[in-house]
Amino acid sequence: MPFGNEVNIFPLISTLRKKKYSVFVPYIQEFYFKMIPLRMPLQKNVFGIYESNNSTFNLIKVDAVIIPVLGIDKDFRRIGFGKGMYDRFMSCLKKKVYVIFVARSPNYTPSVITESYDVQGDCFVTPSALCLRKHNGSMVCNRRYNLRIIGGRECISYHKKDF
């Protein structure tokens, strides 16, 4: 669920539920979280994040994970609030899942500022940009939009034929 300056994903969650997708949300317990089915009403926890009531549920299969981010770095890794909760959750999954990062604005740093254990995305979506991580690690972005470079003056080039 969104926190602070992260993008509001409630409209996306609503659309997924209307299409009969199973939606799971984090339930925070101290320094980790588990995924539980989304149930209304949502309540604010001690961190000010909306969450469903706790439930016992074994998450068997995950196809994709949508993770709010503040931005991404050169390695297509998440820039967030630094608590490591998504990192710990993703490391517990039995297989690699498709990771979709969503952000309010297309913030990107051409430097590596994350660690190897930080969550690495496959797709980065903002209202003005769509970027995909290719198998060789390079990034391809929607040509109509530009990423906002943070922490540097380097440019990113796009090739429409790749997208």
Name what the model sees in each region.
Residues S14, F81-Y86:
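Charged helix-capping and loop-helix junction motifs
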Residues S52, I67-L70:
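A structured binding-face within diverse protein domains that lines the active/interaction site
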Residues F31-P37, R77-I79, C141-N142:
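Short, well-ordered strand-loop elements centered on a beta-strand within folded domains, enriched
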Residues M1-K61:
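N-terminal active-site beta-alpha-beta segment that forms phosphate/nucleotide-binding
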Residues P2-N5, L70-K74:
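Short glycine-rich anion-binding loops that position phosphate/pyrophosphate groups of nucleotides
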Residues I60-V65, K74-R77, R88-F163:
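Surface-exposed, charge/polar-rich loops and edge strands
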Residues V23, I66, G82, F124:
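Residue-level signal for inorganic ion chemistry
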